[in-house]
């Protein structure tokens, strides 16, 4: 009955129950007629009316009409007993008060039994119909659930109750031997361990596999993904249990296993008190707030409830979107101020800093696309170098306490304009820190973030959807990858640790071959490598075969926090950096900016 609308289902159940409770008392009377001396038709009508009213009141009290009866179990039977017993007792009391006669208990006992048999039987009939006669018409996909714990049980029951999910749980698997062969709910048993999945998929013609282990680690997820990769089978996972328990997400809001899940790492436990001291009840400004990293920093900052957050960006649409999102989530507790401004506009940056006097600035505004900046090198200088200089000097003038610049691994030994512009931006930050004791300037350096705008993942996904080929520059090219939320959280932690002048380097894990990334995406799309061709296009201008997070002279062996290192980066004086910038602006060339960034003279 779950495929019917809620109102129609309620109406049908109420109508069936009305017929049962109205006529059962008359049937009971005729069964017991030889024993009656005082009962009349009027009294039977009174009893029928009382039963009709009291039953429907009890049904709503015990929520009988909002159950998925096609999956009824003992708990639903207990509800029927409670509702029927309550209505019989109420009727017995009403009739006794009205007539003044002692209640005829056998009549009520027979009526009670008929209610249980007929009402329970109507639900049982529907269950049998759905299971053996009508199930196929609902076009549910046979589903295997990985994990038979609390989350898995919750998910299976939700699938049974919801036709909207279009999933039919067939069985579960779990590596816990104590759960083997147990029945989670009628018809759904734990039938093996995770390694048995391929055999079980073939045996039961499974179309969907759902990982119902909310606290699963990344390495375990990789193992399960490798086991579950089969043609025509989609791998999904349920949301985190914390999101379900908090009400932020429903248990049935499943998501595909993405490459971000496979390349991401187990989250670092942050020093929440330290970060809270930096953000809570403070005014925070984020440049590039509409971008991939900038917008996630804004979300993470708002989780600590600053007094005000200033969303500064050049693109009005992206600022509109993040402003709307944050207002919906945090608008009651945080003053959210969207500002359309360009970091290249020096006067505007000074005006904004002076007006709002932020406690901390997270500078995420930057051009980051290597080939585009090779074709437009002057824009890299204006935005990444001069924009950083304007924003940082405005922050210094307004006596901002913390200035955190988002840098990149491409700033290490840069062979291209984009990386060189970010290295010179780091020089600006460090030199300004030497000039003031009121603002702590710091840079945080990390590699590629998964899923950011302009990254290879959206490109590869698009190419796979179009049937290929997937274009990779070189079979041996590697990159470091990190998820956007992880990078943003570590940026906040690094900012809280900053004492001034540091270039923090985030531990990016092991580098990943781009071709392996492409192969993973092809598998996750449900296709074989043979279905989608991979072609090699050659290294583009300014690209490196591999990236470095620190050069050999910058390596610092000790972590200052889990996954955060302090790079031993060479400092330059403010007047030296100023001279470099003036030379680049007055007589620009690609070679000059790259040479300066690598510690060589301009020419």
Region annotations inferred by a language model:
Residues 1-139, 167, 230, 237:
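Signature of alpha-helical transmembrane segments in polytopic membrane proteins
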Residues 2, 269, 274-278, 431-448, ...:
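Strand-loop microenvironment adjacent to phosphate/nucleotide-handling motifs in alpha/beta enzyme folds
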Residues 2, 35, 129-237, 241-244, ...:
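A solvent-exposed beta-alpha-beta segment
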Residues 201, 205-207, 306-307, 353, ...:
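Proline-aspartate-enriched helix->loop->beta-strand connector
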Residues 221-283, 396:
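Flexible, Lys/Arg-rich cytosolic regulatory linkers and terminal tails that connect or flank
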Residues 231, 247, 363, 367-370, ...:
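Conserved Rossmann-fold NAD(P)-dependent oxidoreductase catalytic core, especially the SDR/UDP-sugar
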Residues 284-302:
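N-terminal Rossmann NAD(P)H-binding glycine-rich loop of SDR-like oxidoreductase domains
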Residues 340-360:
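Conserved Rossmann-fold cofactor-binding substructure of NAD(P)-dependent oxidoreductases
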């Amino acid at each position: 009955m779950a495929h019917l609308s809620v109102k129609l289902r309620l109406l049908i159940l109420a109508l069936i129950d009305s017929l049962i409770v109205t006529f059962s008392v008359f049937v009971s009377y005729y069964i017991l007629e030889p024993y009656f001396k005082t009962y009349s038709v009027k009294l039977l009508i009174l009893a029928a009316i009382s039963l009709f009213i009291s039953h429907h009141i009890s049904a709503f009290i015990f929520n009988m009409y909002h159950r998925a009866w096609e999956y009824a179990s003992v708990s639903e039977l207990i509800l029927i007993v409670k509702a029927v017993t309550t209505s019989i007792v109420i009727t017995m009391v009403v009739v006794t008060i009205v007539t003044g006669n002692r209640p005829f208990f056998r009549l009520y006992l027979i009526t009670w039994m008929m209610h249980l048999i007929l009402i329970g039987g109507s639900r049982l009939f529907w269950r049998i119909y759905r299971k053996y006669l009508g199930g196929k018409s609902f076009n549910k996909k046979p589903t295997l659930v990985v994990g038979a714990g609390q989350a898995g049980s919750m998910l299976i029951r939700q699938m049974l109750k919801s036709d909207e999910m279009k999933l039919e749980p067939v069985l579960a698997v779990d590596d816990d031997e104590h759960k083997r062969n147990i029945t989670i709910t009628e018809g759904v048993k734990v039938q093996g361990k995770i390694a048995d999945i391929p055999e079980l998929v073939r045996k039961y013609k499974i179309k969907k596999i759902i990982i119902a282990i909310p606290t699963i680690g990344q390495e375990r997820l990789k193992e399960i993904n490798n086991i579950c990769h089969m043609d025509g089978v989609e791998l999904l996972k349920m949301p985190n249990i914390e999101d379900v328990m908090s009400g932020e997400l429903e248990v049935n809001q499943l998501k595909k296993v993405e490459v971000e899940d496979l390349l991401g790492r187990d989250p670092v436990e942050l020093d929440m008190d330290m970060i809270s001291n930096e953000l809570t009840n403070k005014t925070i400004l984020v440049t590039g707030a509409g971008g991939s990293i900038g917008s996630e920093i804004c979300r993470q900052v708002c989780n600590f409830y600053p007094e005000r957050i200033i969303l500064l960006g050049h693109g009005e649409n992206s600022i509109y979107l993040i402003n709307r999102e944050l207002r919906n989530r945090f608008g009651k507790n945080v003053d959210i101020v969207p500002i359309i401004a360009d970091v290249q506009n020096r006067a505007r940056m000074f005006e904004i800093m002076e007006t709002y006097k932020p406690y901390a600035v997270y500078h995420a505004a930057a051009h980051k696309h290597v080939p585009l900046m090779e074709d437009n090198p002057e824009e890299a200088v204006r935005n990444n170098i001069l924009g950083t200089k304007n924003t940082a000097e405005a922050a210094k003038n307004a006596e901002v306490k913390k200035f955190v610049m988002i840098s990149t691994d491409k700033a290490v030994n840069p062979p291209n304009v984009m990386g060189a512009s970010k290295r010179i931006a780091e020089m600006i930050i460090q030199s300004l820190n030497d000039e003031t004791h009121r603002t702590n300037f710091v840079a945080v350096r990390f590699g590629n973030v998964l899923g950011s705008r302009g990254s290879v993942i959206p490109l590869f996904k698009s190419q796979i959807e179009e049937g290929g080929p997937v274009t990779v520059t070189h079979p041996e090219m590697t990159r470091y990858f990190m998820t956007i939320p992880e990078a943003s959280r570590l940026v906040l932690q690094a900012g809280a640790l900053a004492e001034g002048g540091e270039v923090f380097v985030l531990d990016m894990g092991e580098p990943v071959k781009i071709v392996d990334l492409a192969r993973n995406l092809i598998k996750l799309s449900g296709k074989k490598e043979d279905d989608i061709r991979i072609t090699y296009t050659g290294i583009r201008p300014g690209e490196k075969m591999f990236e470095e997070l620190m050069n050999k002279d910058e390596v610092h062996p000790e972590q200052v926090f889990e996954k955060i290192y302090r790079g031993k980066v060479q400092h330059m004086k403010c007047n030296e950096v100023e001279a470099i910038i003036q030379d680049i602006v007055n007589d620009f060339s690609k070679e000059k900016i790259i040479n300066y960034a690598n510690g060589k003279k301009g020419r």
